[in-house]
């Protein structure tokens, strides 16, 4: 997979749902990729890309495909309405001037997820960062960027955090390394404020925060940071996003997703919420 709300309205997520449903309709009608391509006068590869949500689905395409598959008028109208919603830009599209296109897909998945799990070996996860911490981290990754671009990226990062305040907020389970707390980002004052933020959010009923201490030794998480997404919609697969210095990847093959889930669970077993809060409180005092 190359790209990739607990309600359904994030455009990329809607496109994925629509693609999966169209594929199911095609298979139920015993129609081949070639049959569908002929109806739209496109190539079979284009149909495959439509079903995989790699390109936008025009409402007219949806209508013609469903007519080919023998759908009734009510089904056609419902699918066309879904296609129109999927083509509406999300709020994050207004930040396309400040972030790469692949990241807008990430925000769509994050906004649409019912469950989020993250592993962070170096920095506090973006959803829990304070303004000053986020600014320092983003500045480090944008050495030649303008102040305006930096400000836009910080604004986007903080706006993403509003999903934790929604009535239908997703559950968030963060596993992070103790090293994150020892890496002084910007200043002791910034770190103290950041740790206080972590202590506050760890009390939210839908947020779990586990800090793996140095005492845990070598463990399954000695790897790159990753985020796991699970959606309420049964059509959607679980997805893992992982990144390295110069690249990022979205994984939806079951074997890859399970490997990351198991690693996350094993790391969480190395600590507890109580131990994590105690460690956070100790580190807060060290930065005082």
Spans of features found by a protein language model:
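C-terminal regulatory/effector modules of DNA-binding transcriptional regulators
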Residues: 175, 185-288
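Short amphipathic helix-turn modules centered on a small-residue break
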Residues: 48-50
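Key DNA-contact positions within bacterial/archaeal DNA-binding proteins
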Residues: 34, 44-45
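Interdomain hinge/linker segments and adjacent boundary elements that couple functional modules
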Residues: 2-20, 24, 28, 33-38, ...
């Amino acid at each position: 997979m190359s790209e990739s709300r607990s309600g359904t309205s994030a455009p990329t997520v809607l496109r994925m749902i629509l693609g999966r449903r169209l594929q199911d309709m095609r298979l139920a009608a015993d129609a081949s990729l070639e049959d569908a391509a002929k109806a739209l006068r496109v190539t079979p590869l284009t149909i495959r890309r439509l079903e995989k949500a790699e390109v936008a689905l025009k409402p007219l395409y949806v209508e013609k495909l469903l007519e080919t598959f023998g759908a009734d008028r009510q089904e056609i109208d419902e699918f066309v309405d879904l296609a129109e919603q999927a083509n509406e830009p999300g709020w994050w599209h207004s930040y396309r001037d400040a972030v790469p296109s692949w990241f807008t897909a990430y925000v769509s998945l994050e906004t649409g997820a019912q469950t989020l799990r993250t592993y962070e070996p170096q920095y506090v996860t973006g959803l829990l960062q304070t303004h000053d911490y986020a600014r320092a981290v983003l500045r480090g990754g944008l050495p030649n960027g303008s102040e305006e671009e930096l400000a836009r990226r910080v604004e986007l990062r903080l706006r993403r955090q509003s999903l934790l305040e929604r009535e239908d907020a997703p559950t968030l389970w963060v596993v992070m390394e103790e090293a994150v707390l020892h890496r002084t980002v910007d200043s002791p004052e910034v770190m103290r404020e950041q740790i206080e933020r972590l202590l506050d959010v760890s009390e939210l009923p839908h947020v779990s925060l586990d800090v793996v201490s140095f005492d845990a030794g070598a463990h399954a998480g000695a790897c790159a940071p990753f985020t796991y997404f699970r959606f309420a919609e049964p059509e959607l697969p679980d997805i893992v996003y992982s990144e390295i210095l110069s690249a990022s990847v979205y994984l939806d093959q079951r074997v890859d997703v399970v490997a990351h889930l198991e690693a996350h669970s094993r790391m969480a077993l190395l600590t507890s919420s109580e131990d994590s809060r105690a460690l956070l409180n100790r580190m807060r005092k060290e930065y005082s």
